[in-house]
């Protein structure tokens, strides 16, 4: 079956689909659909999607980015929490036989098992236009649960992308910066203005690619302890480090110095 070129990226086509189904945006899901083909092409290119790739897309919406991914990849699994979008996805993706849609909360999906089943356990690529309110739990969940991921290429709030990529000495440097950079190398691909979305978000956005480290930059015996110390340290910036560590999660053993080695 010859793949059909993506067509949903054009604003008029998005509007037509929304009107056809009388779709009402759900604020609780943070829905902002991309309507710029150039940005969509840039996301797929940044993710390095090729004909051998199995891709997991989080939050496909009406299937706009999904079409672009399906056109480039071997297969796509799209996880959508909003049941009202499922009939729309069945329509907009009907020309693509390499897409599977799962109606579920991605935080409840065993992506490691999915990778094992669909990709023979090989690292997968994750691509998403993420709801901004749940960006950090999703990204850190992928890393902390040790899902076999090659890279994560996502649209996020620009402020969050800056925090992920920034280095020591910046006012934006914090626990999120350290956590993301422990697992991956972040690279901001592009800044995306509000007019590239429907409806327009109130904040600027950015596409960021997180490439998983082949070798971890730090060896640790206890990731949970290490990140507890990191969070406590940054939460107590105006207090002494000793007081910050004292307020860390109630670990009595081992000693904090045993939690990480360089």
Which sequence ranges carry the predicted segments?
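Single conserved hydrophobic/aromatic residue that forms the stacking wall/gate
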Residues: 251-262
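C-terminal lobe and adjacent flexible extensions of AdoMet/dcAdoMet transferase-like proteins
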Residues: 232-253
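Catalytic cores of RNA-modifying enzymes
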Residues: 1-232, 248
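Short, cationic motifs built from Arg/Lys/His that form the positively charged side of catalytic pockets
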Residues: 163, 237-238, 257
